[in-house]
Amino acid sequence: VAFELARFLRRRHQPLPRLLLVSGARAPQFRRGHVPPPEPSDAEFVEALRRLEGTPPEVLEDPELLRIILPALREDAAIYRHYIYAEEPPLDCPIRAYGGTADPNVRPEHLEAWALQTNAAFGMELFPGGHFYLQTYRQEFLAALARDLTE
């Protein structure tokens, strides 16, 4: 969302962000030619959440709680599932990418590819853990974020 907002601002000749931060996200060019997959069933969607290890198991095992939160989680996932990348020139703002070393869906090369989306500086930092590395390495991430925002 932040990447497309920066591109939208550029098309409108508005100031770009001083720094674009992305976390746990493949570079958008990996979506080139993407065809959105069919909507998963509730059971398939919950199993995908379980594999990402970011939602507590007790939440995923509580039918009443799932009934409340599943629609919002599905909408969030739909934004990504239906995103189609369109080629444009690289941005003129720096990009900093963060990710987890054990993320099964976003490998280091997916993060490194963000460098192709900028004419300015690019940096990347990996933290131990999977897609939700922030849950375990919150302090380390916040220290890196503070450093990057003050450079």
Language-model segments: residues:
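Short, proline-enriched alpha-helix->beta-strand connector loops that line the catalytic pocket
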Residues: P89-I95, T118-A121
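Active-site nucleophile elbow and catalytic-triad environment of alpha/beta-hydrolase enzymes
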Residues: L70-E88
